[in-house]
Amino acid sequence: MSEGNELAGVWDVHRTGGFLPPMRGIVRKRIEDGHGCTVAAGVRFRFVVDGLRLRYPFGLVDELVPDGHDAYGGTAMLFGRTLGTFRMTRAI
């Protein structure tokens, strides 16, 4: 199974550090068929899945690392600079 397939589904996201705003309960990622969107307070930010990277059209990249069963640690980067870190877990 490829990473894209493993990432398919709906994910809850929460901040773990850096300059990202609080996210618990207000941010979700929806992923399917090699693309997806981050939904924050009703606003959608679309991305494409590139292995374990989520690439947004405006220079933002979320780099993911497996972090347990149905969970990933993430680093949000803008033009190669770290903005912050987050953890995403599969929504039930």
Predicted regions and their residues:
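Coil-to-beta-strand transition motifs
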Residues: 69-72, 81-83
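Edge beta-strand at a domain terminus
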Residues: 3-6, 78-92
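Tryptophan-anchored aromatic micro-motifs
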Residues: 1-39, 74-76
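Short acidic, gly/pro-rich beta-turn/loop elements at beta-sheet edges
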Residues: 64, 74, 84
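Contiguous, well-ordered beta-strand patches that form the walls/edges
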Residues: 18-19, 30-71
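Ser/Thr- (and often Asn-) enriched beta-sheet segments in non-cytosolic proteins
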Residues: 10-12, 53, 87
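Beta-turn initiation residues at beta-strand->coil junctions
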Residues: 56, 76-78
